[in-house]
Amino acid sequence: MAASVKPTRRYESPRRREQAAATRAAILEAAQGLFESQGYAVTTMSAIAHAAGVSLKTVYVVFETKSGVLRALWHLLLRGDDADVPVDQRTWYHQVLAEPDPERQLRLNARNSRIVKQRAAALMRVIRDAAPSDADLAALWARIQSDFHANQREIVASLHERGALTPGLDVERGADVLWALNHPDLWHLLVGQRGWSPEDYERWFGDTACSQLLVTPHSGER
């Protein structure tokens, strides 16, 4: 009987992994600048490669498509790092759900919203604007909206379980309210167009969420 041949294991040195990570980061940084300054449709893979200082082939090898670049960039900005951990498994999200005080819970949610939007709000508009003409991005935008609503619903459900929701407000309507207050379009209107500071937005979001959702808003953290 012929001896079985074990497949050769591919060895990647730490240095090579570091170089690959640096190349990926350079491409994403270049793509972010181009997408946010001139939009998705105008930005080409060649332009991304040139801005990143890499070959066009490298961009295709790493991300395959332009929508793949945008999708990877979105996940990076949403999560704040390259770790493949969904939002609903992030420590900061679980801290919101675990917060026992209803008002502090909503204000912590507002703070996290401000932090994420400072990183990712501009790219959200790029994705939204490109979605009608690109099936991949249409699916990404739909998923963003769905996940966003589901996360806010989970927060409202936790308030409902503790009897903290204002009378007459059920979980579904409360989730819609919190989702609307937390929507990136409102950030764009208030911060982008009206010139509110991110801190003003966070305070308004927290105040409004408490007044709309909670049975008895407290003094809270101002």
Walk through the language-model features, giving the residues of each.
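Helix-turn-helix
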Residues: A26, A30, L34-G68, A72
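Residues in the recognition helix of alpha-helical DNA-binding motifs
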Residues: V62, A72-L73, I155, W204
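Amphipathic alpha-helical packing segments from all-alpha helical-bundle domains
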Residues: R111-R128, D136-R162, E172-D176, T208-L214
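N-terminal intrinsically disordered/low-complexity leader segments
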Residues: M1-A22, P217-R222
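Hydrophobic alpha-helical connector segments
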Residues: A72, A83-Q118, A175
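Hydrophobic/aromatic-rich alpha-helical bundle segments in the mid-to-C-terminal region
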Residues: H160-T208, G220-R222
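Short, basic, alpha-helical segments at the C-terminal edge of helix-turn-helix-like DNA-binding modules
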Residues: M45, W74-D81
